[in-house]
């Protein structure tokens, strides 16, 4: 019987599927190995235990979010780009809840792979905000504000805190409109 070959990328894709399907509590070396059809010991050639898997998944998920956002705003500018960014951010969080949660692992220091992945997300926000007139530190401050507002909405939505009869889509449109109208143009 031939041994099944695995690599870090396939492991992280399986780990992402596990957390997107059942949350962080479902993530284990055994669960990922089972999904890949290998013995758990095979994973240790690529990761440093469960802590390494969690950290590598955070980098993978943060990179995925950055790519998702960049794809949404390419060839857009101004408030159109701001709206596309907000919609894509919410969509990623809704379609990939486990990966979105994994992006919240704080980067330990600048220059490491997780810090660099977080910087890529900030760069997308800063580029979009440059198209509406923000530069330098001001762009970073406004990026934090916009991201915080969107993160707050999607976090409340994820825990089921928006249960009234008032339509969530309309609320999100209000949020986007408020953010867009508050920005320089």
Language-model features: locations:
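Amphipathic alpha-helical linker/stalk segments
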Residues: 59-84, 115, 122-127
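Amphipathic alpha-helical segments used for helix-helix packing
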Residues: 92-112, 123, 155-163
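Amphipathic C-terminal alpha-helical segment
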Residues: 148-165, 180-185
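Hydrophobic alpha-helical connector segments
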Residues: 70-99, 110, 119, 136, ...
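Amphipathic alpha-helical packing segments from all-alpha helical-bundle domains
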Residues: 108-144, 166-181
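Alpha-helical DNA-contacting segments of helix-turn-helix folds
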Residues: 19, 53-61, 103, 107, ...
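Helix-turn-helix
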Residues: 10, 14, 18-52, 56
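Generic hydrophobic, amphipathic alpha-helix propensity
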Residues: 7-16, 57-61, 65, 69
């Amino acid at each position: 019987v031939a041994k099944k070959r695995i690599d870090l990328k396939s492991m992280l894709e399986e780990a992402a599927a596990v957390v997107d399907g059942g949350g962080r509590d479902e993530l284990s070396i055994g669960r990922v190995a089972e999904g890949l059809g290998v013995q758990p010991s095979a994973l240790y050639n690529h990761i440093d235990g469960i802590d390494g898997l969690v950290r590598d998944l955070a980098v993978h998920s943060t990179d995925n979010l950055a790519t998702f956002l960049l794809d949404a705003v390419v060839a857009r500018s101004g408030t159109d780009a701001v709206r596309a960014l907000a919609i894509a951010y919410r969509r990623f969080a809704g379609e990939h809840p486990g990966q979105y949660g994994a992006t919240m692992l704080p980067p330990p220091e600048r220059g490491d792979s997780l810090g660099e992945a977080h910087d890529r997300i900030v760069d997308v926000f800063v580029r979009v905000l440059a198209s509406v007139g923000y530069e330098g530190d001001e762009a970073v401050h406004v990026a934090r504000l916009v991201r915080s507002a969107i993160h707050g909405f999607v976090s409340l939505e994820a825990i089921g805190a928006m249960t009234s009869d008032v339509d969530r889509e309309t609320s999100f449109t209000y949020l986007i409109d408020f953010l867009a109208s508050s920005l320089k143009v």
